[in-house]
């Protein structure tokens, strides 16, 4: 069924319904995998591209490449250039490197996330993870957001099952 829903649109081009971009990254030992998603009205979404940054994630140059990637602009079908508005990165592997990278990013741009199956909400409140020498949490230190993976996976599967309306419009949450 999912195969039958596929659409033919150019990767790395934001479609006309896309209003802003987000990105998510997963860190592995030998690479960082990233997806950029365009979001439109009513949570309609398009995968703009899937990118792999190869290299040992213990090395600084891999993280510098991630920084360069996160600053990319993507062409909108209107000709405008859109930046990535928000960047989530999983901190389950290479946790300290993820926190270090997030700290270096502009305020409210990058967020370290940690998935949990026991979450009762899709996205929890941030938890400060940086401490000073006395064990007090730093006000402007790195934070990690808990992500309810079971809830989000269930929601994603529901969105993937949606079909185009008879009038050619798309229902809320439709994934292209």
Where are these regions (language model features)?
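Structural motif
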Residues: 33-35
